[in-house]
């Protein structure tokens, strides 16, 4: 009778027990009353001991009633183990349950499934799921929730979604488990999709829902939706939960809205370490280094930072170049008891290096018993930053001797060293090691090698690497095209550009900034226009650098109007923009427009630099505006206080020389405060040849050879002057000197774009397409020109030939004439022609082209090394000032 009376009291006492000692006293009472064999009280004791983290006591209770014939007891002990993280034991007792004569019920499986999830044992989880299906418990809400949670935790989201979809009834736990699974495994779009489905149901999200879905909003950068979720959190009151506020802070930092993140942080009633860590690390990711460090230092008494936060702040000291602060953080870590693993020491090396203390950085490195790849990379990077490239190379060699594992970062750093030092031997050694270790498979390493070989003058090796690669990425193509442009191999550069356009690689702004100058150099107008259309499609036209490149491209492709149109449409202009437009007008002999543009530039508030004055004096020179050009030179010195460089003096000499003021040019040279170089005298020499002042030409030629005997361009210019004077001994001496020094002159060639093809011609070329027809066409033109009084100028023949016919043959075979004849043969009558030449047009070709334009009734635009010439009706736009 006493037992029956005492049972309800003991049951209530067990349920309300608040600590372990109280529970033990009640347990003793249960034993004294003989109730310890009761399944009911044993089950409650097992549950209560597990609640107080005493699974051993739970097991002891279970053993007193073994063999258990009631599933309630089995469920209690399995739940006790699972609840306390003893997942193997939980599954062990589930196995024993299966071996007994007792059948599991629907309450058994949530704890068993939790154990499978805790062990990440998908195979066991699938087996349990099959048993659930066999027993018909799959429709139970709690079993379904446990299965969704298990598969979600394991990242088996397809299975989780399948279980979720098949559940006849779902509660908030079901939705939360699935949302959390998708979000925690980076499937943010799916997480948002499930969240929106939840909002459309009758179930109201809670704090767990919000905290689970916040990372999805942040990572997908859906700002408006994220702000809407913040509003829901405020309205529903879940923002009072610290984990929700932490998620909101993280979300706004992902949105790059640190002000909003800080507002949420400041309004939090309760903050934990995660709150501070999130804010500090978020500032660092946004490169708000000072704010991050300030928050860390000001709140050290409010929270305990984790290792990630302290390490991040320590790294920030390197960015701030604050060595004393770094030492303070380091001492804090020691006092706080942080274990200084290699990661922290690697950061220390990096910080000391950035602060310029390589001695301490090396001491930290040398003191490390276990150095990993990051350690080596950190110290090597430090020496590279400090400019001690040789020590960086020594460390790499030491690394190889010690058989330490180098990674792609190591190779990228050392390849940059070999590039900076132009050390091809070391670079080839890196390449060889990279092939052996398999590092060269890394795309960034291959790109760096392409760049290294190109900058060391081995473009062929760059192209070999490129051809052995797969598709590569945008950087790959940009690097190869840039290499071709740098070394003047425009034909290959064009081929690579065409290949890139046919590939699936998406160009970036750097692509356009390297291909547009190439089109400008080649005067590849059609390709330039296609690239312009392409950059419009990708939205780059409004970029300032792109606008500047387009102005240059169109101006050098013979499309001055297009250059002007691009210039007018630009919403922003810098000094480069104005310089490009002024130079463009100069190339076409539009000196007045160049001066107007210069005046507009001054009115706009842009202060001209030294390069602008080179462009404006150049424009005046090619337009015969001597007084205006001299005025600009004086303005540069007196008004803008720019000290003239040799280039400015060369422009003024050219200005005077082109206007046949040769004596004034020489006077100007004599008055120069700096010693004139060959470029100064070259302008005078060209003017002498044009005017026929061969006495001055001979004197100037001697000066040029004395000043720069190794430059093929200046040497050939002097040689041609001596040839015009018929001083063949001087010509022979110059050519022998160049030959002995293995110096070769740039061969002259011209090209013309007809249809979609570019046709290139060299002087005397008889292997070109339609060669026979070209020469026949020229013969007809020469006979017509003779009637106009044309006589070939023998001064343009630089070889010692006695036969006049031989001289005539050489002159008549100049490359620009072949290109013009080809254009006449392959275009409709009256169609304007555009021919490009890599060298300066000779006087005889200039005269011939004027006559051809008159005879055939066509405009012929020729770009040579100096400027554009528009030939029309027997005249040239340069007015014979070229």
Curated annotation (Swiss-Prot):
Q: Please tell me whether the keyword Ribonucleoprotein is annotated for this protein.
A: no
InterPro entries referenced in this protein's UniProt entry, alphabetically: DYW_dom, E_motif, Pentatricopeptide_rpt, PPR_At4g14850-like_plant, TPR-like_helical_dom_sf
Keywords, comma-separated and alphabetical: Repeat
The PPR repeats extend over 3-37, 38-68, 70-104, 105-139, 140-170, 171-205, 206-240, 241-271, 272-307, 309-340, 341-371, 372-406, 407-441, 442-472, 473-507, 508-542, 543-573, 574-608, 609-639, 645-675
Which is a GO BP term held by this UniProt record? RNA modification
List the Gene3D superfamilies hit by this protein, alphabetically: Tetratricopeptide repeat domain (1.25.40.10)
Where do the segments described as Type E(+) motif lie?
A: 756-786
Q: Which GO terms describe its molecular function?
A: RNA binding; zinc ion binding
Would I find Repeat among this entry's keywords?
yes
Q: Where is this region: Type E motif?
A: 680-755
Spell out the residue ranges making up region: Type DYW motif.
787-882
Describe the family membership recorded for this protein in Swiss-Prot or TrEMBL.
Belongs to the PPR family. PCMP-H subfamily.
Q: What is this protein called?
A: Pentatricopeptide repeat-containing protein At3g03580
- Species this protein is from: Arabidopsis thaliana (Mouse-ear cress)
Give the source lineage, highest ranks first.
Answer: Eukaryota, Viridiplantae, Streptophyta, Embryophyta, Tracheophyta
């Amino acid at each position: 009778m006493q037992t029956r009376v005492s049972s309800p009291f003991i049951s209530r006492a067990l349920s309300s027990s608040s600590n372990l000692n109280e529970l033990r006293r009640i347990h003793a009472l249960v034993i004294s009353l003989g109730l310890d064999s009761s399944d009911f009280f044993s089950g409650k004791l097992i549950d209560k001991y597990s609640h107080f983290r005493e699974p051993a006591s739970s097991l002891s209770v279970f053993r007193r009633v073994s063999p258990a014939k009631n599933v309630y007891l089995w469920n209690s002990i399995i739940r006790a183990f699972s609840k306390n993280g003893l997942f193997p034991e939980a599954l062990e007792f589930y196995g024993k349950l299966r071996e007994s004569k007792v059948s599991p019920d629907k309450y058994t499986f949530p704890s068993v499934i939790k154990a499978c999830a805790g062990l990440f044992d998908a195979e066991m989880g699938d087996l349990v799921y099959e048993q659930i299906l066999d027993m018909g418990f799959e429709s139970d809400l709690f079993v379904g929730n446990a299965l969704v949670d298990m598969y979600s935790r394991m990242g088996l989201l397809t299975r989780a979604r399948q279980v979720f979809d098949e559940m006849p009834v779902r509660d908030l736990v079901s939705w939360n488990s699935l949302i959390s699974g998708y979000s925690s495994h980076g499937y943010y779009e799916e997480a948002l999709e499930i969240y929106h489905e939840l909002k459309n149901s009758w179930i109201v999200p809670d704090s767990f829902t919000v905290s689970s879905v916040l990372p999805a909003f942040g990572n997908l950068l859906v700002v408006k939706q994220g702000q809407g979720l913040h509003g829901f959190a405020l309205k529903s009151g879940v923002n009072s939960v610290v984990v929700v506020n932490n998620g909101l802070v993280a979300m706004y930092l992902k949105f790059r809205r640190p002000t909003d993140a800080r507002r949420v942080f400041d309004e939090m009633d309760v903050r934990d370490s995660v709150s501070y860590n999130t804010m500090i690390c978020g500032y660092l990711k946004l490169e708000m280094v000072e704010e991050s460090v300030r928050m860390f230092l000001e709140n050290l008494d409010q929270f305990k930072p984790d290792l990630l936060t302290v390490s991040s702040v320590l790294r920030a000291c390197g960015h701030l170049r604050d060595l004393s602060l770094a030492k303070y953080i380091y001492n804090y870590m020691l006092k706080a008891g942080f274990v200084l693993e290699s990661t922290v020491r690697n950061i220390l090396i990096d910080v000391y290096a950035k602060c310029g203390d390589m001695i301490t950085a090396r001491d930290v490195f040398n003191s490390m018993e276990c150095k990993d790849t990051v350690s080596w990379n950190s110290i090597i990077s430090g020496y590279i930053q400090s400019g001690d490239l040789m020590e960086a190379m020594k460390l790499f060699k030491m690394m190889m001797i010690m058989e330490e594992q180098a990674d792609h970062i190591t190779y990228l750093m050392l390849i940059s060293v070999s590039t900076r030092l132009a050390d091809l031997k070391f670079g080839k050694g890196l390449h060889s090691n990279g092939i052996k270790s398999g590092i060269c498979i890394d795309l960034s390493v291959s790109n760096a090698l392409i760049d290294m070989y190109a900058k060391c003058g081995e473009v062929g090796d760059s192209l070999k690497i490129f051809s052995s690669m797969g598709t590569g990425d945008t950087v790959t193509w940009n690097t190869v095209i840039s290499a071709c442009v740098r070394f003047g191999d425009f034909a290959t550069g064009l081929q690579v550009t065409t290949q890139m356009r046919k590939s699936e690689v998406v160009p970036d702004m750097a692509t356009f900034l390297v291909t547009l100058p190439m089109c400008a150099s080649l005067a590849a107008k059609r390709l330039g226009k296609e690239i312009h259309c392409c950059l419009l499609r990708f939205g780059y036209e409004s970029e300032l650098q792109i606008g500047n490149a387009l102005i240059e491209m169109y101006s050098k492709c013979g499309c001055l109007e297009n250059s002007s149109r691009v210039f007018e449409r630009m919403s922003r202009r810098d000094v480069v923009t104005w310089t490009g437009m002024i130079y463009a007008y100069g190339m076409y002999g539009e000196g007045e427009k160049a001066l107007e543009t210069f005046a507009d530039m001054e009115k706009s508030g842009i202060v001209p630099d030294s390069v602008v004055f080179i462009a404006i004096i150049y424009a005046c020179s090619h337009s015969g505006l001597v007084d205006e050009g001299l005025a600009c030179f004086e303005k540069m010195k007196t008004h803008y206080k720019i000290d003239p460089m040799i280039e400015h003096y060369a422009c003024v000499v050219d200005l005077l020389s082109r206007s046949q003021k040769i004596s004034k040019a020489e006077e100007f040279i004599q008055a120069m405060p700096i010693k004139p170089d060959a470029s100064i005298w070259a302008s005078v020499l060209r003017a002498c040849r044009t005017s026929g002042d061969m006495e001055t030409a001979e004197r100037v030629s001697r000066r040029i050879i004395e000043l720069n005997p190794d430059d093929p361009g200046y040497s050939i210019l002097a040689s041609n002057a001596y040839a015009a004077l018929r001083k063949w001994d001087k010509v022979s001496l110059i050519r022998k000197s160049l030959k002995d020094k293995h110096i070769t002159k740039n061969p002259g060639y011209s090209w013309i774009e007809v249809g979609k093809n570019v046709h290139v011609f060299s002087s005397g070329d008889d292997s070109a397409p339609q060669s026979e027809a070209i020469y026949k066409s020229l013969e007809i033109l020469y006979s017509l020109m003779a009637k106009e009084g044309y006589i070939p100028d023998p001064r343009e023949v630089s070889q010692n030939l006695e036969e006049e016919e031989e001289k005539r043959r050489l002159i008549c075979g100049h490359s620009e004439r072949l290109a013009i004849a080809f254009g006449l043969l392959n275009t409709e009558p009256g169609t304007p022609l555009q021919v490009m030449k890599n060298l300066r047009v000779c006087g005889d070709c200039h005269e011939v082209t004027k006559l051809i334009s008159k005879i055939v009734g066509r405009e012929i635009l020729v770009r040579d090394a100096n400027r554009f010439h528009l030939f029309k009706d027997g005249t040239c736009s340069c007015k014979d000032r070229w």
